Design a protein with these regions (language model features):
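Soluble ligand-binding/transfer domains with enclosed cavities or grooves
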Residues: 2-384
Length: 384
């Protein structure tokens, strides 16, 4: 995997910690930071592989040239095999929010940085996404009445900012990852889908990047099944994994009632000329689900002398080509060699961003599976 060095998402000055500005000059202890809730799992740096699809606008003024000439089209379907690094900084502390109708509340959260490279062409990584942002934990409210929620605040270099709010829950075992359809639809009429020839993997004469998917079909990396349902990649990654628990986080810029709040803001270029109501590529909605899974691995520990420590990869299984974390053993004496069970977090996500142009709404889908970038310490309980 092309290495991306990110120790933290965003570096904060030493000693910086959110809290309430005191109303008296007499020194008082800082308030304890509120719970991060499900966001406590967002610690350190994760990396992994994924897949991205986006229908891009195509125009006569700055057309994209393709290996094989195709009839004029208002769009190009871009497909990306991806490498991703997702890095989290330490929690912010107690972030006060003042209320007029209800009492004040305090939030807590973690800054993050998401960096994605296109690696469709081996040896030629291309940066396609850079997203600094915040994940914030919001306590339960009585005015408005709303349970505890999480919020993702994201800034996208193309000219879009996102506020997506939602809820979380825990399930035992593997998640049930639903299918995702990339087919565009008539704006405001999601049942009126408009499929395009570029969604047919075997058709090499369509406005698509890459245009010829033959080599990828042969390699099993971009297939018709993947175009029909990008989330199938996530299910492949976990098919043979032993997952004990899953924290599920669902967020949206337009969450379903009783939740509300959130939204999207675009720069003028994306909105287009308001007089003609013809956006260039207006982002109108984002929704995503994150599955934070606890994976149980087997690692084979050789004989070790007291004081020795070793970095070990798990015993390989059919993992769908996905990365697995490394583990570092404590300095204990091990004799004879043994296989032990260890656990580590894994983040999977499926995200849909909806763009409006030329009378249609175009789903932009991203999926990935991410594991800890640094070796995971083996806990003492693994030796019991």
């Amino acid at each position: 995997m092309h290495e991306v060095r990110l120790d933290t998402a965003l570096s904060m000055p030493a000693g910086f910690r959110f809290s309430e500005v005191p109303s008296h000059t007499i020194a008082s202890p800082l308030a304890l930071a509120p719970s991060l809730g499900p966001l406590a799992a967002f610690t350190g740096t994760f990396r992994g592989h994924g897949f991205n699809t986006i229908f891009r606008p195509q125009n006569a003024k700055t057309p994209t040239t393709l290996p094989e000439l195709v009839p004029a089209s208002d769009n190009i379907l871009e497909l990306n095999l991806t490498e991703e690094t997702l890095s989290f900084s330490p929690g912010l502390g107690s972030v006060p929010n003042r209320g007029e109708v209800r009492g004040d509340i305090a939030l807590n959260g973690v800054p993050y940085l998401q960096v994605i490279n296109d690696v469709t062409v081996p040896g030629r990584p291309v940066g396609i996404h850079f997203e600094p942002g915040l994940w914030m934990a919001v306590p339960a409210l009585d005015d408005p009445v709303e349970g505890a929620t999480v919020v993702r605040m994201a800034s996208i270099p193309h000219g879009t900012t996102v506020q997506a709010q939602g809820e979380s829950f825990i399930i035992a075992g593997k998640p049930d990852i639903p299918s995702i359809d990339i087919t565009p639809f008539v704006t405001a009429q999601p049942d009126k889908k408009i499929p395009f020839p570029s969604q047919t993997a075997a058709d090499g004469g369509t406005p698509r990047i890459p245009q010829d998917l033959g080599p990828f079909i042969a390699a099993g990396t971009i297939t018709q099944a993947l175009l029909a349902d990008p989330a199938s990649l996530l299910r492949t990654h976990i098919a043979a994994q032993s997952i004990t628990t899953t924290m599920v986080i669902t967020i949206s810029t337009a969450p379903a009632a009783p939740l509300f709040g959130g939204g999207i803001s675009n720069i003028a270029f994306l909105l287009g000329n308001p007089a003609t109501s013809a956006p260039n590529a207006q982002v109108v909605k984002m929704e995503a689900t994150f599955w934070i899974e606890t994976i149980e691995y087997d690692i084979e520990v050789p004989a070790l002398e007291l004081g020795q420590s070793l970095r070990i990869s798990p015993v390989r299984t059919e993992d769908g080509g996905q990365l697995v974390p490394e583990f570092v053993t404590p300095p204990l004496r091990v004799n004879p060699p043994r296989i032990i069970k260890v656990s580590a977090p894994q983040i999977q996500y499926a995200q849909q961003v909806f763009l409006n142009f030329n009378g249609l709404t175009w789903p932009h889908v991203s999926v990935a599976t991410l594991v800890p970038a640094a070796p995971v310490p083996v806990s003492a309980s693994a030796w019991a």
